[in-house]
Amino acid sequence: MSTLVESPVPSNDSQAAAPAAYDPTQKQKSQAKTARIPIKVVAAEKLKKPEWIRVRAAAPGSRFYDIKRILREHNLHTVCEEASCPNIGECFGKGTATFMIMGDKCTRRCPFCDVGHGRPDPLDTQEPENLARTIAALKLSYVVITSVDRDDLRDGGAAHFVECIAKVREYSPDTRIEVLVPDFRGRLDRALHILNSGPPDVMNHNLETVPRLYKQARPGSDYAHSLKLLVEFKKLHPEVPTKSGLMLGLGETDEEILQVMRDMREHNVDMLTIGQYLQPSEHHLPVLRYVHPDTFAMFEREAYAMGFTHAAVGAMVRSSYHADQQAHAAGVN
C-alpha cells in the first residue's frame, strides 16, 4: 500500500536529491510518471486482498495470444494492456478488446492509472483504416474505442474519434461502437461539434471518483466539467445512451458514491459501471478499502431505483468489461 502527502516545496539545500532528468519524448510509467504530481505516493503496508478479488486467467486454447499478435501486426494499442486491466485474460480469451487510439502516451498523470505519460507522438493518419480492418478481421459485433488524453490537440482528438467511427462503420456496418472519451477540457464545444458529425452508438465518459478526491486522483480534470460533457452530448443526441463509471477504494464514502450516482441521473446518464480500484504498483494511489460484495449489491439496487437503464456493479467490473452485454441490456441492438 501507499500513503499520500502534499509535495514539499523544493529545497535550496545543495544536499537535496536532484530529481531524475525528465525526457518528455519518453513514455513515463509508475514512479517516473507519478513523481511530478502535487500529491506524492509514499510506500506503506498493503491491505490484504479479500477472497472475492479473483482475476480470471485466459483459458487454455483461448484466443489470448492470437489477439495480441493481431494487435501488434496492425500497430494498435488496447487499454486492456496499457492500463494493466485485471480482466485482460478473460476478455482477450473471448476475442474482445477495448482499442486505445491516438498513441500510448497520455498528457495527464492520473496516479490511479497505469497508462504511460509523455509528449504524445503525431496522430497516425493510417490508424482509422488499421483499426477498421482489424475489427473486420476479428468479426467483432461490438467494439469499444477509447484514447489517452490529448491536451496537445486543438480538438482533444475528437476528429480522430469520428474518423475511426466512420471507418469501422464502412468495413463493419453491423458492428455497434461505444466510445470512452477523455474530458476534452478547454475544447468541449469544438469537440461536441465535431462528434455531432458521427456520433457513436454509446457515449461513455468516466467520472472515476467523487469530487472531493479529484485533486489527488484526477489532477487536471474537473468534476463539473465531466458532468457537463455527458449532459451536453445527451442534449445533442437524446437517442444515444450515455454511460459513466466509478472505482471504489480511494477513500470515498458510500454516501458520496450515492450522491455521484444522483448527479449522473440529474445529467441524464443512462448506464453505470462501478468496480473495485486495484493498485497497479506501489507508486500509484493506495487501496484504502476493499468493498464488500454486499455493498456492491446495495449500489446496484440503488442504481436501478434511481432509473439507470443498466448498472454493472461488482469488484471486478471495469468500464468496458462485458460492454456488449451492458449495451444490449440497455437496448442497443
Curated annotation (Swiss-Prot):
Catalytic activities: [[Fe-S] cluster scaffold protein carrying a second [4Fe-4S](2+) cluster] + N(6)-octanoyl-L-lysyl-[protein] + 2 oxidized [2Fe-2S]-[ferredoxin] + 2 S-adenosyl-L-methionine + 4 H(+) = [[Fe-S] cluster scaffold protein] + N(6)-[(R)-dihydrolipoyl]-L-lysyl-[protein] + 4 Fe(3+) + 2 hydrogen sulfide + 2 5'-deoxyadenosine + 2 L-methionine + 2 reduced [2Fe-2S]-[ferredoxin]
Keywords, comma-separated and alphabetical: 4Fe-4S, Cytoplasm, Iron, Iron-sulfur, Metal-binding, S-adenosyl-L-methionine, Transferase
Domain Radical SAM core positions: 91-309
InterPro entries cross-referenced by the UniProt entry: Aldolase_TIM, Elp3/MiaA/NifB-like_rSAM, LIAS_N, Lipoyl_synth, rSAM
Main localization of the protein described in the UniProt heading: cytoplasm
Keyword S-adenosyl-L-methionine: yes
SMART domains per record: Elp3
Cofactor note: Binds 2 [4Fe-4S] clusters per subunit. One cluster is coordinated with 3 cysteines and an exchangeable S-adenosyl-L-methionine.
PANTHER family tied to this protein: LIPOYL SYNTHASE, LIPOYL SYNTHASE, MITOCHONDRIAL
Family stated for the protein in its record: Belongs to the radical SAM superfamily. Lipoyl synthase family.
Name of protein: Lipoyl synthase
